[in-house]
């Protein structure tokens, strides 16, 4: 049976676009912005902290920013999977 893995995204800012290929060993490259010189890399959640430390040591990397989407409150009006709260009106 298929088991869902927790994955997260890292935004890696580069000095040069030609170094984007080197990031494929760290995870799945989803998007590469050539104008703003960053790459979105998806990887398993348990590998993130070790990978951030490795990437910060690389000379071709300017900055590494993890995704904060899991920490945001996603319980808002219009969300299909939000917790149902009793209505005040009805």
Curated annotation (Swiss-Prot):
Pfam families: DUF2129. Its main location: cytoplasm. HAMAP family: UPF0298. GO terms for cellular component: cytoplasm. This is UPF0298 protein SSU05_1549. InterPro entries: DUF2129. The lineage of its organism: Bacteria, Bacillati, Bacillota, Bacilli, Lactobacillales. The keyword Cytoplasm applies. The keyword Transferase does not apply. Keywords: Cytoplasm.
């Amino acid at each position: 049976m298929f088991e869902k893995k927790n994955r997260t995204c890292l935004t890696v800012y580069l000095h040069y676009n030609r170094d984007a290929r080197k990031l494929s060993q760290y995870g799945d490259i989803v998007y590469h912005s050539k104008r703003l010189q960053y790459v979105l890399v998806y990887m398993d959640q348990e590998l993130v902290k070790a990978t951030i430390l490795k990437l910060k040591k690389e000379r071709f990397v300017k900055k590494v920013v993890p995704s904060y989407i899991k920490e945001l409150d996603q319980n808002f009006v219009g969300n299909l999977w939000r917790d149902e709260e009793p209505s005040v009106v009805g």
